[in-house]
Amino acid sequence: MPLSYQHFRRLLLLDNEAGPLEEELPRLADEDLNHRVAEDLNLQLPNVSIPWTHKVGNFTGLYSSTIPVFNPDWLTPSFPDIHLHQDLIQKCEQFVGPLTTNERRRLKLIMPARFYPKVTKYFPLDKGIKPYYPENVVNHYFKTRHYLHTLWKAGILYKRESTHSASFCGSPYSWEQELQHGSTSLNGEKGHGTEPFCAQSSGILSRPPVGSTIQSKFQQSRLGLQHKQGQLANGKQGRSGRLRSRVHTPTRWPSGVEPSGTGHSDNLATRSTSCFHQSEVRKKANPSLSTSKGHTSTGHAVELNTVPPSTVGSESKGSVFSCWWLQFRNTEPCSDYCLSHIINLLEDWGPCYEHGEHHIRTPKTPSRVTGGVFLVDKNPHNTTESRLVVDFSQFSRGTTRVSWPKFAVPNLQSLTNLLSSNLSWLSLDVSAAFYHLPLHPAAMPHLLVGSSGLSRYVARVSSTSRIYNHQHGTLQNLHHSCSRNLYVSLLLLYQTFGRKLHLYSHPIILGFRKIPMGVGLSPFLLAQFTSAICSVVRRAFPHCLAFSYMDDLVLGAKSVQHLESLYTAVTNFLLSVGIHLNTAKTKWWGYSLHFMGYIIGSWGTLPQEHIVHKIKDCFRKLPVNRPIDWKVCQRIVGLLGFAAPFTQCGYPALMPLYACITAKQAFVFSPTYKAFLCKQYMNLYPVARQRPGLCQVFADATPTGWGLAIGHQRMRGTFVAPLPIHTAELLAACFARSRSGADIIGTDNSVVLSRKYTSFPWLLGCAANWILRGTSFVYVPSALNPADDPSRGRLGLCRPLLRLPFRPTTGRTSLYADSPPVPSHLPARVHFASPLHVAWRPP
């Protein structure tokens, strides 16, 4: 006969009419009973032949992937001028006095951050933008390309200009200024890694007349065409104080994408003479453009008379130029949907390439990418804006994977101990938190994203058109890419992007200047950064509480008025060091803080309402007596596991599900087990804050007996059959709690101390979790444990009762930094009547 739910509750001692605990509880450790109950509840894992269920509510498992939804109206989020000040440490010291060792070490980690993996795989540019939306290939290409362009303009990305140079926008850091082109001495340079580079403001190279004298100045080498040493090598001071740099290595292509061919001169000429026709048109209109001028970030103007890398091919090919987009201008339309109709809409499509405000030397950067990108909704609640997903998973895979540094995440009890109080709370929203932290330029070659240009991208993902390397740029295959879909897509995109369609249709390679989200190092660095900043704020305002997890910052104060003044002071400090806050998203919580999925108040912690709603929804859709795919079980356990500490039986109640996932078997929910779990999760109990106190109750056990010391009273008992020592110790702790009601118990068993009851027999683990809920444990060495003698049957001997204090812990999160013993060296502040008692400290 199947086990009923009421009978099962009585078995787990969850009802009050159970017998004496000392008799009932040891029975739950019996292996035979556990097996019989598992059979009755259908918790065994038979190999079922019935087809598995792969979907429960929103949870999907094997063989069913959710189809991503593309939104053609996605907006690209704007990125403010994010620039974390380099003198961050000095500004913090002005604010709070000398920094602690921990704070200084953490802030130095991110100024700048460094990332040097052992092995980096490079992928062809075609894999730069992932064809994530097969139905919206062109739309997705341009929206992603626009997102990348926005990041570059915001100073978050470097743009690869050549093998050894890159450009960027925004304010340069000192380590970037040391690498600037043209800012170092140009005498005695070694190799091409130190060559100066010139910005071209128009992005178009002007071509002087081709002549054989120029050709002789170059020599062929393993790295392509190299300038002969000694010619034009010395910088000369111009009459207006301008620095005249020597010609950059001719293997630099304006697009930042070098040809993948073997270096044949005809190929080089075609690829390098970017938009030859358009630059000629512009030269006639504006003769001053014949010598491109730009500015390096030091403010000196740098002049560059550009030299064609080859003459062999340019003469034979005539005026065939490599700008795929503009080639359509001079061709006959092939159909009503020919791209030439769109290209002829505008006379001036703007430059083919843009260059940044500043240029630096970089380590060798191939014309490849190391990760693909695609767009998704910003979050489930905001589908109007897009978010860029960067896939750098290569660094987490294989034998050469990077082992990311670990960092402490506050567990539920630590969080409750720290934040459960009668404070008023608010949350601060840091805009694009990851993009605050600068990366060293030497890490750029490992974190490359980009695209191969529209023509190659369309050719790769469409089955009708093909562009082959040896034909690239020739008129025969130009119209192969014309199609109705492409024509309609481009016409619609023209409404949005206008002449930028031309710029975005060119290839580009970008490297990260700030830490990207797709690398395991980034969460670690962000956690170090925000925890150091919060530590500084806590020491500046010792009567308040500041705490962070990743980019989530919370402030607490005794009263709302005090919180308002604290908010003003802290936001001014954060803005002064370059941390960009989105003040519109500041949330004032009152006395119940919403943080990390929890609601934390003076009464303790509970899961947020939306999580409770998800759990109810999950149980409503959970099928009974049907095998559920173990992958779906993983998703269910992920949701239920988050709320498990708030239930009677906790994690042990989920052990049958964990077992099926480990065995990779389907799981069948029996009506009784589902009803048991459902009842568990419908009544949630808050996790309370631990209070400091003195331990006066001790428990100990041997395999055959147990002993308690409650104040000056001693008790002992024996088990019917010998038990494993950990099980015996757990039973002793349960007896101590039930007999004394004390919430602080001393024990010498590390497994009981850890409060992880999932390794015990299933029924015992569930019952013990409920009995010991809210109990704090203190470690007492066996030799000093007053309950040691009673557990061995010796009641006559009384060891002196220890005075063991219990102090609640906040874990390894190093959240609360006390003021250092050194004087603060701050000018005397104007004191105001604080609404707080001076002696009050955060919990």
From Swiss-Prot:
EC number(s) on file:
2.7.7.7, 2.7.7.49, 3.1.26.4
One GO MF annotation is: RNA-directed DNA polymerase activity
Q: Where is the composition biased (Basic residues)?
A: 239-249
Against Gene3D superfamilies, the record matches this protein to: 3.30.70.270
Which cystines does this chain contain? none
Q: How is this chain's activity regulated?
A: Activated by host HSP70 and HSP40 in vitro to be able to bind the epsilon loop of the pgRNA. Because deletion of the RNase H region renders the protein partly chaperone-independent, the chaperones may be needed indirectly to relieve occlusion of the RNA-binding site by this domain. Inhibited by several reverse-transcriptase inhibitors: Lamivudine, Adefovir and Entecavir.
For the region Terminal protein domain (TP), what residue ranges are annotated? 1-177
Q: Which domain of life is it from?
A: Viruses
- Extract the ranges annotated as region (Disordered): 180-202, 226-315
For this UniProt record, give its keywords in alphabetical order, as a comma-separated list: DNA replication, DNA-binding, DNA-directed DNA polymerase, Endonuclease, Host-virus interaction, Hydrolase, Inhibition of host innate immune response by virus, Inhibition of host RLR pathway by virus, Magnesium, Metal-binding, Multifunctional enzyme, Nuclease, Nucleotidyltransferase, RNA-directed DNA polymerase, Transferase, Viral immunoevasion
Region Spacer, residue ranges? 178-346
Q: Which Pfam families match?
A: DNA_pol_viral_C, DNA_pol_viral_N, RVT_1
Where Mg(2+) binds, per the record, is at 429, 551-552
The Polar residues compositionally biased stretches are 262-277, 287-299
According to the entry, every stretch annotated as the Reverse transcriptase domain falls at: 357-600
Q: What reaction(s) does this enzyme catalyze?
A: DNA(n) + a 2'-deoxyribonucleoside 5'-triphosphate = DNA(n+1) + diphosphate; Endonucleolytic cleavage to 5'-phosphomonoester
Would the keyword Iron be found if you checked this record's keyword annotation? Answer: no
Which portions of the sequence form the region Polymerase/reverse transcriptase domain (RT)? 347-690
Site (Priming of reverse-transcription by covalently linking the first nucleotide of the (-)DNA) found at 63
- Described purpose of this protein according to its UniProt entry: Multifunctional enzyme that converts the viral RNA genome into dsDNA in viral cytoplasmic capsids. This enzyme displays a DNA polymerase activity that can copy either DNA or RNA templates, and a ribonuclease H (RNase H) activity that cleaves the RNA strand of RNA-DNA heteroduplexes in a partially processive 3'- to 5'-endonucleasic mode. Neo-synthesized pregenomic RNA (pgRNA) are encapsidated together with the P protein, and reverse-transcribed inside the nucleocapsid.
Q: What else is known?
A: Hepadnaviral virions contain probably just one P protein molecule per particle.
Which family does the record assign?
Belongs to the hepadnaviridae P protein family.
What's the domain remark here?
Answer: Terminal protein domain (TP) is hepadnavirus-specific. Spacer domain is highly variable and separates the TP and RT domains. Polymerase/reverse-transcriptase domain (RT) and ribonuclease H domain (RH) are similar to retrovirus reverse transcriptase/RNase H. The polymerase/reverse transcriptase (RT) and ribonuclease H (RH) domains are structured in five subdomains: finger, palm, thumb, connection and RNase H. Within the palm subdomain, the 'primer grip' region is thought to be involved in the positioning of the primer terminus for accommodating the incoming nucleotide. The RH domain stabilizes the association of RT with primer-template.
- Protein known as: Protein P
Q: Which gene encodes it?
A: P
